[in-house]
Amino acid sequence: MHIDNAITTTIETKTWRKSDTTWTLGLFGTAIGAGVLFFPIRAGFGGLIPILIMLVLAYPIAFLCHRALARLCLSGSNCSGNITETVEEHFGKTGGVVITFLYFFAICPLLWIYGVTITNTFMTFWENQLQLAPLNRGVVALALLLLMAVVIYFGKDLMVKVMSFLVFPFIACLVLISLSLIPYWNASVIEQVDLSQISLLGHDGILVTVWLGISIMVFSFNFSPIVSSFVVSKREEYEPEFGREYTEKKCSQIISRASILMVAVVMFFAFSCLFTLSPQNMAEAKAQNIPVLSYLANHFSSMAGSRSTFSITLEYAASLIALVAIFKSFFGHYLGTLEGLNGLVIKFGYKGDKTKISSGKLNLISMFFIMGSTWLVAYINPNILDLIEAMGAPIIASLLCLLPMYAIHKLPSLARFRGRPENYFVTIVGLLTIFNIVYKLL
């Protein structure tokens, strides 16, 4: 596959600024959240061969899809215009409404997913690590959501600071856990590879496993919510001095490096989990509807014979890190969901007039809807991977893959990017992810 020269000799002779490093880490940190804790389950579900194929696809999916979205954001005439303003400029007010809906429905299902996840993670920690009697699911979900609602309502600024602070400790913990699992690696996943029994088609075939894995990669390797802000920042910094073409290449360079970091950390974590567990263990984790760290904690707690202090520490650390990761991701996506829902309420409930309702009342109304719907989904307890594949990933793909490809096909300002092989790749990734909805209904 051809990936055009985003990193050119000219760009390499320019100074790499501190702000470029900051944004590289910012994009990287945005993507590394609770979604990563489910990727090893889907990736390892089919054994070694599908995850090796996903390893090959991971960087192109992460880099090319986000670069396409960045190019759309760069196509607006206003350096300070965000993606909504850019889409409105190109496609009118209807386009602005569509992008507002897409943003809201791309983020809100993620909150539902995290609501289910944090409830299940807390309950399995309570029952397996603390060895306490089972609790009522509805009460647990309500208590956890009320706790987060109180933190959000009374300490938004503190929440943002804590959330930002937790990004890199969480990444460090993922790397440390991946390294810590090495002594527990085994060859079972390799021994189970039987080339004579490999099936390409069918429900458990390699093609279907990789297809569903692409959806989880789109979900897990996703920093699209921050791409618009990133592009605006880089345009304001570079475009007046070096021009738009250079700014586009600089954005591509930063996205490329962030994608490399992200793929390296997530794939190492996935392989470490797979070599510690087995495809059968991954199937159990999916059936139990818990993230892989919670399953690892339960796995270590059920080990026969005498256990080392290290394995006991890892058992508790895995559960606590999972809880922190989900809290972090929930808070981050809550802010985006609140902003999107507030925009929809003002646009359709008050005809765009912000003066007709106070911000406090608007936030309270939106909070009741968000928390109420999240509690209901958490209580019902749908399978998280199925929810990701049927709702979260397809909506993200429509925004991350298909919208930029449509813009490149239609807009004169993006005409120079037409006809490139990577466009077909991004389009296929988007369509495959969306077609998961049809597959889930069959």
Swiss-Prot record:
One of its GO terms (cellular component) is plasma membrane. Its main location: membrane. Keywords: Amino-acid transport, Cell inner membrane, Cell membrane, Membrane, Symport, Transmembrane, Transmembrane helix, Transport. The chain crosses the membrane at residues 21-41, 44-64, 96-116, 139-159, 162-182, 206-226, 258-278, 312-332, 364-384, 388-408, 422-442. It is found in: Cell inner membrane. It catalyses: L-threonine(in) + H(+)(in) = L-threonine(out) + H(+)(out); L-serine(in) + H(+)(in) = L-serine(out) + H(+)(out). InterPro entries: AA_transpt_TM, Amino_acid_transport_2, Hydroxy_aa_transpt, Thr/Ser_transpt_TdcC. Involved in the import of threonine and serine into the cell, with the concomitant import of a proton (symport system). This is Threonine/serine transporter TdcC. The gene is tdcC.
